[in-house]
Design a protein with these regions (language model features):
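Conserved catalytic network of the ASCE P-loop NTPase/AAA+ motor domain
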Residues: 5-6, 39
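Small-residue (G/A/S/T)-rich helix-start motifs and N-terminal tracts that mark the onset
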Residues: 7-10, 80-238, 242, 246-263, ...
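Internal gly/pro-rich beta-alpha loop/helix module
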Residues: 11-12, 17-108
Length: 395
């Protein structure tokens, strides 16, 4: 037929075969064209949405174009950021085409751009000192889980924190000799945190600008009560991760009534537990679910995964495209917690700190993946953060 030869011989294919209103499976000649585009060696650029992809769900309607690039017209659609849609879209580029704002914006979401991160990150003043770069407190670790406290501390240090204190239990305090820059102290005599330790920890925390709580804490009932004491009494910013998220659900903590500014960093499984939903439901409604949760609880939510979604309490969300499969290893989330805490300590508000922290964390992994796609560790990612930060702030 007339269209076969160009598809087989062209260098670039512009896909504008089907628009955003697709409601049934693709068939007939259109299906044949999509199959030929996917079999072609040419670069494929889809206009607004890859043909055959549902713009609302991100699911292929029978079959869909596997684009190298997708140009989102006037607004991002759910398929650009939801799985599996984003895999069909390739790299998503944004283009305004002059539509009124009310018509153009169908989804309150934006992709995080390197330029935006560079503009958000604070520049160091020539005369600054460690006291101006944030005193970070990390409540983490339990017997056998000291590595989580270590990694969160590493993340904070390499993200530029002025001082980092790790508060843990005695058996996890062995990290004190691993990183001399960490100020490690222990409380109590138990293998895990208990509610009886809350008062001492809060007294220590009076000196801190921001807290991070959760990595490696464990899920003992006493630890859950300890977490509730901290969250309901701490009045400064706090990053809530890992086992502390489990306590939020089990102790029925009303996040909207907590006095501090909260940043929650669950992965899909943790968010499913937190909301009483299945992991499949969370993935299917990754953006809308994150936005609803952040607005209802008045928190900043970092829903980790591919892609990571940062939802603000004003109802807007940001989608991160940095990061790669090599980062699917233990401890990556602990490192991210430390990075975000460090940025909050550098006088960033929770929302931009989460945006920048997630982007830098993923970019650090991407830089490592250029040399070693698989096999690098969370510690390696932490050590790469200064280079990633330098890259995004270069003129």
């Amino acid at each position: 037929t007339d269209w076969e030869t160009p598809l087989e011989s062209g260098d670039v294919i512009v896909d504008a075969l089907i628009g955003t209103g697709l409601s049934r499976e693709v068939s007939g000649v259109k299906a044949e064209v999509i199959e030929m585009m996917n079999a072609s060696h040419a670069s494929v650029v889809s206009v607004d949405v890859p043909s055959g992809l549902s713009s609302d769900t991100g699911e292929p309607m029978g079959l869909a174009v596997m684009a190298d690039y997708t140009v989102a017209l006037e607004s991002y659609k759910r398929c650009h950021v939801l799985s599996p849609g984003h895999e069909y879209c390739g790299k998503v580029l944004y283009s305004a085409i002059g539509l009124p704002a009310a018509v153009g914006r169908s989804l309150p979401v934006s992709l995080i751009e390197e330029r935006e991160v560079g503009n958000l990150l604070p520049l160091r003043e020539r005369m600054c000192h460690k006291g101006k770069n944030g005193f970070i407190g990390i409540i983490a670790g339990s017997a056998g889980m000291e590595g989580a406290a270590f990694l969160a501390g590493q993340g904070a240090l390499h993200a530029g924190a002025g001082k980092v204190a790790v508060v843990t239990v005695p058996k996890a305090a062995v990290i004190a000799g691993k990183v001399p820059e960490l100020m490690v102290s222990s409380v109590g005599d138990s293998d895990f945190f208990t509610s009886a330790m809350a008062e001492e920890v809060l007294q220590k925390a009076e000196a801190y600008d921001v807290l991070a709580i959760g990595p490696g804490l464990g899920r003992d009932a006493e630890t859950q009560r300890f977490v509730k004491e901290i969250l309901t009494r701490w009045r400064k910013p706090i990053i809530v991760d890992a086992d502390a998220l489990y306590a939020v659900k089990e102790m029925e903590i009303d996040l909207a009534r907590c006095p501090g500014q909260l940043i929650l960093t669950p992965h899909v499984g943790e968010f499913a537990h937190l909301t009483g939903r299945t992991a499949a439901d969370v993935e299917r409604e990754r953006i809308d679910g994150a936005i609803t949760f952040a607005m209802d609880r008045e928190v900043t939510l970092v829903l980790k995964g591919m892609p990571t979604v940062i939802a603000a309490k004003d109802g807007f969300a940001y989608v991160n495209e940095t990061g790669n499969p090599g980062m699917a290893t233990g401890g990556m989330g602990d490192t991210l917690t430390g990075i975000i805490a460090a940025l909050v300590g550098q006088e960033m508000d929770p929302e931009p700190a989460a945006i920048c922290g997630v982007y830098l964390h993923g970019l650090s992994g991407d830089l490592l993946a250029r040399e070693t796609p698989v096999g690098y560790t969370a510690s390696d990612v932490a050590r790469m953060v200064p280079r990633a930060r330098e890259m995004v702030t270069e003129d």
